[in-house]
A protein has these predicted regions:
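Membrane transport/envelope proteins' first extracytoplasmic loop
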Residues: 1-270
Length: 270
């Protein structure tokens, strides 16, 4: 039962392209934002808010027709933005004098949280996190069977399968949709089956992680989680440097995301 944990943990970092960390956004990032994030540089949050506020004010008030009212409104806006930025600056240490740009490589690794009915009795026994097969990051170790090649094929976590009695060749239902289990796997980033990074205990019975083809992923209907992983361009020498890099990268990431009118929903360095 522990094999999926041990194999992934012991061989994972290089062979299975383990991430240096991951983050989730509320909306999908375009190529421009991803390229900006990869530089590791900070965006100018204060200027972003000023530009946005000026555009909104220009739409409401004619500067030439009402110059005094415009100037008064603008002065108030600038004061509010400066207060707002000062709070963010203090909370996230955005003006840290020791900040260093941390270039990274970003990979999309979207998932859906679906309902799993592993015995096809019409009732969901737990949740299954479904990823599309990829070759870039956080790969899976194949422990039995094969990786999915068809839209109705799925590979699920080996430890979960052992615990609930599912074998290669069985069928399971994912949010009411039938899939044939063609493989048992261990994802390198799920050496233990924690559904959330904040979970203290892992649950290998009511939580499963799975791989399908891109076509299979597109056929599902639950909300897509815009989940991105990163690897540092320059590998940290030790845990101290790794911590420093993750702290600096978080500051840069946060500013870039805010200036693209998106929200950072999760951030977890390795």
């Amino acid at each position: 039962a522990n094999e999926s944990m041990l194999v992934a943990a012991n061989e994972g970092v290089t062979k299975y392209k383990l991430e240096d960390g991951h983050f989730e956004l509320d909306k999908k990032a375009d190529e421009t934002l991803l390229a900006a994030i990869e530089t590791g540089t900070k965006a100018d949050v204060r200027q972003y808010y000023l530009d946005k506020a000026k555009k909104e004010l220009d739409e409401k008030l004619d500067e030439k027709a009402y110059p005094e009212a415009y100037d008064k409104a603008w002065d108030k806006i600038v004061e509010e933005i400066d207060d707002k930025y000062a709070d963010a600056e203090e909370k996230y240490e955005l003006n840290d004098p020791d900040f260093t740009e941390v270039p990274v490589k970003i990979y999309e690794n979207f998932f859906r949280n679906e309902e799993e009915d592993y015995n096809n009795d019409g009732e969901a026994e737990g949740n299954i996190r479904v990823y599309a097969k990829n070759d870039n990051v956080d790969l899976a170790c194949l422990l039995d069977g094969a990786f999915p090649e068809k839209a109705d094929e799925i590979a699920i976590d080996r430890m979960h399968a052992d615990n609930v009695g599912v074998k290669v060749g069985d069928e399971i239902s994912v949010s009411g949709q039938r899939f044939k289990v063609v493989g048992l796997i261990a994802y390198v980033n799920y050496a233990t089956l924690h559904e959330k990074s904040t979970d203290m205990m892992f649950d290998a019975i009511k939580f499963d992680v799975a791989m399908v083809t891109q076509e299979g992923f597109n056929s599902l209907h639950k909300t897509v989680h815009y989940f991105y992983t990163w690897n540092y361009v320059d590998t940290p020498a030790d845990e101290v440097e790794q911590k420093a890099k993750s702290d600096d990268f978080m500051k840069a990431l946060l500013t870039q995301v805010v200036c693209d009118d998106k929200e950072l929903e999760d951030y977890m360095p390795r």
